[in-house]
Amino acid sequence: AANIGFNESFSFIAEFGEHGNRQQQDTLGKERLTKINELYAIPYHVGAGLNYLGNYLGDDVLAKSIKSFSKSRGRVPLKNILAEITDKETEWFFDTYLTDREAYDLSIKRLIKGQESIRLTVSEKNSKPVPFKLDLIKDDQLISEKWIEHSGRDTIIELKTLDADFVAINSNRFLPEKNRPNNWKYLKSNSGLKPLKLTFYGDSENLKRNQLFYHPISDFNAYDGFTGGMRIYNTRVKNQPFEIDLHPQYSLKEQSMVGFFRTRYRFINHKSKNYLNQLFLTGKSYHYNTNLRYTSIQPSFSMYFRPYDLRSNKRQLFNISWFNVFRDRDPNIQVSPDYSVLNILHRYNNSDAVNVFATNSNVEASNEFGKFYFSTNYRKLFPSGRQFAVRLFAGKFLWNNISANDGNYFDFNLNRATDYLFRYDYLGRSEDTGIWSQQFVPAEGGFKAFFDDSSANDYMVSINASVGIWKWIEFYGDVGILKNRNRSAKTYFDSGFKFSLVPDYFEIFFPLYSSNGFEPTQARYATTIRFVFTPRLSTLSSLFTRKWF
């Protein structure tokens, strides 16, 4: 594990908010702060800044100034007291560090090595002035340090190497930064690249190494059976600009390699409502039926928006994705095994602990079809602990060039979405009978009861509602209308009881009454019971690690 000292922990904790672009100015009033900033991020950020300022000034200058400030009972500003005691510049602390919510980003931009000396350029990304300490490290020991005034413009420095292993800016981590790894350069390599280190499970930053983490993983689906493998990733405790996540696995049932990967690059904007942009490239390859493999490659771009007031819960997302699917041909599916679909998504969310409201608007386009679909969710938690939830879904084909002979693969579905983009965690996505066909994924129509004619190639509208009865038992009801081309519209309904044993991860639905009639008296009632279940440990663990921001 990376070793972090007590004083270093102040900046380490302060950086959590900065890396997620959730931090606020230290000078804001309490009434304008989010809980995480009020209780943790800002106190730690101020503490880290004072510690850094004290180290920079030296000779107990800061301690003496704070003592004088206390004696004056705040009548004389600390900034003025410091100006009388020291000739060193302190405006950077009061005018920038405390008032600018964007963290510093110092970096060693250029490094030229000589026989016994080096020449390097230190830059601050936003041209903000700040003093920094330039260190030489050998055998994990600090052998030289020097404080340097940085005016905001690039600073060129020459110094003796002293046979050091590393040159580093602020090796003690006292100053919070948003990209600390670029503070270090390895002097024993011509390229300056740091050595690679493989570490079991994620950790905090080891600034002397380029880190890759790994740990074992397992998964399950009906066609690959149990899969086991290794997760390899560079994701640290704090968000990084570039992240890569590889999940190579071996399928015991198919006796072949499967898995997925994801790469992400983050662009943070601290001074805009468009506070975050992300570029993704993801891919996966598993089996969607016995001996039938699918591979999906998806480049995407996301833009995230929020109000300037971070206490507001309003959030918006705009995403554009290009899904490319390649499948082994299934004789039971007539459409081409390979296809590409453009998806454009807008998402709006305004939720708190009591009220949840969210909308999703999607447009999909391909050579075969174009469609628009919209969903909105509302959930309210009452003081008694009961909750009421309602969801609306509406979808319409804009064009549809799929012939009737090609089946309903791309159609809307009332009770079991086809998932032709392979986005949902179906355990048995091609099953029509058996336990895996009873898995419920809350998508499209959202019905729990099964109907013989549940797909629509023209339009579909449905409403799903549920209300708490007692603790984890709820009553649900659904109503919907669907229409196929050249056929009359049909209306369906269903109702029943939902047991939320582990909400969103393990739930069971018992149908009661539907368009089929009284469900418990129907033949093979057990086959109509639906369930929500995820076997992925990483997904289940998120139930216990949901962020509080």
What are these language model-derived features?
Residues 148-149, 155-163, 170-273, 291, ...:
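Outer-membrane beta-barrel initiation region
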Residues 210, 224-228, 255-259, 275, ...:
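Residues that define the transmembrane beta-barrel architecture of outer-membrane proteins
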Residues 1-48:
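Acidic/His/Gly-enriched intrinsically disordered linker/tail segments
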Residues 32-113:
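Amphipathic alpha-helical substructures
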Residues 218, 278-289, 300-302, 342-468, ...:
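C-terminal outer-membrane beta-barrel translocator/porin domains of Gram-negative envelope proteins
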Residues 499-504, 525-549:
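Outer-membrane beta-barrel "beta-signal"
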Residues 61, 86, 90-93, 106, ...:
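Beta-strand-rich binding/interaction modules
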Residues 67, 210-222, 228-236, 240-252, ...:
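Transmembrane beta-strand segments that form the barrel wall of outer-membrane beta-barrel proteins
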